Amino acid sequence: MKTLWLTAFLFPLFFSAQTEEDLYTELKLNLPKTKNTAKEVRVEPDEIYLDKKMCFILNLNDADNEGEKKQTEYGLVPYSYEIKSLKGELLFFGVAKKDEAGNWKGIVDFNIIGKKAYRNPKVTGATRLMENLVANNVFNKDCSVNLDNLKQFYEKSNTIEKCRGDN
């Protein structure tokens, strides 16, 4: 009887184990939306698509594969990325590394608006950044950036109290 009770209790736990993907939820900031707002994003190894249109170049620097770390202004990191316009303009630069507990932490510079040191636990890398920006109506279908929404996104969701570059 104890075995049956234990099996009934553990069965749902075993088969409902959540992955990191299951635990992910987007930031919901209720930023204004227009008829031109992009609705979906797809991040590939070298490019980023909005509503199935290639809009951005993604440069990943994954030094961790070779056991190395890259020196950045945020210290030695195993992972950094750049998101650029198709014309090569740097829009975002981000780094990610694991903390002492093994959780990924990220910092992003919003170069397009001259802001540095953005951090939010829901933004740990390029994919999560883009998913959250699209979910908060920052990009338009024509690959342009809604700068007002981007500034609001930065101000409302940045968890770093005093951001460098903000005077």
Explain the meaning of each model-derived region.
Residues 19-167:
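Cysteine-centric segments in proteins
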